[in-house]
Amino acid sequence: KDSKFNQTGYIDFAQTVMEKYNNLENAIKDNNFSFNNFKDLTEKQAENFMKGMQANAVPQAEYIASKYNFENHNILDIGAGAGTYLITVSKEYKTVRGKMIDLPQVSKIQNRNIEREHLKDRLVSVSCDYNIDFPKENYDDVFLFAVVHQEPKENVEKLLDNIYNVLKPNGRLFLTSFFLNDDKISPEFSVQFAIEMLANSKNGKVYTHNEIKKLLKDSNFSNIERIDDIPSPATLYIANK
């Protein structure tokens, strides 16, 4: 129950997911019935969802914290979920400071997690819609983990532009998602995930590798690096300002 890999919350949330799958035919016919990108989740549903997301994120967060240097960095974590990534990095690097931004019902849980880990002096979560009210401070790193597949292309374009603008010179963007190959029928996990996004988000889209690289280049990012061997079916992209 108390394991950091505990999946019980996600199992509870799966009931909500299955209710959406039962009407998948309507989504295919473009009669969209789905969550408005998770904005209408109750706090309990959000908490269950984040428990599962936290269990899935732990190996990736530990990988990133051990692989990359964050000494004295100020980090922005967008759509931070349970806060697993920023909390893990902050526990590894005692000089890290950072901010999480997320939906109101999620931000409350993030601040509870920050307090539980005794990190209130260095971390905070702020409730905001990143498509409307983007932070203005400057950051050494921006985390964008499991977010882009929740947004249509025009939102991702704006989001990447905003991230580029708040990054310090040579600042880094860390981005993960489940990407498709150009044929859009592989790899298998990403195809299955694309169907889940169709059933469970209003505007979600699973991008191809070439699509996300083009979006990054169009927002003026450079040194784009693709990393496939993270402990997840997801792919990690790192890009510099």
Regions found by a protein language model. Give the residues of each.
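Conserved Class I S-adenosyl-L-methionine-dependent methyltransferase catalytic core
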Residues: 1-73
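Short alpha-helix boundary/capping motifs
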Residues: 3-5, 10, 52, 77, ...
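N-terminal hydrophobic or amphipathic segments with adjacent small-residue motifs
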Residues: 25, 75-77, 198
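Short acidic/polar alpha-helix capping motifs at helix-coil junctions
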Residues: 51-52, 75, 176-180
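Conserved class I S-adenosyl-L-methionine
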Residues: 71-81
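Alpha-helical subdomain
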Residues: 80-241
